[in-house]
Amino acid sequence: DKSGVMFTVDPVSKDAGRLVIEAVFGLGEGIVSGLITPHHYVIGRSDGAVLDEFVPVQLLAIMCDSESGGTQEVALDEVQGNSRVLSDGELGELRVMGLRLEACFGKPQDVEWCIRGGELSLLQSRPITTR
């Protein structure tokens, strides 16, 4: 399982030709809390090409804890921790979702998403509010 955020316009450079995706293994709480450095992908809007990628080692994930009903920190093994969070196919699916959301709402979007069991789900979409 994996989750993250996507911006349909580069929130730093404001480049509309680039989508920015950040991803972690497990729940997105790891990104929001700053506990886990996410994988960072910049992809081309028109063709989905990976333009830039930062893939730090992730040795920890935030996962659901079915016993407590909360979350727990789980250590990742070396193989998974050194693996890329998102495949090229998943990046492509996210790109398509982001562009559809932007077309639907008429503004660049800040999107929260997750992938569980190979299925991409939209959690939230809102206009980008960075200045």
Q: PLM ranges: what are they?
A:
Residues 1-131:
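Conserved mixed alpha/beta core segments that line enzyme active sites in large multi-domain catalysts
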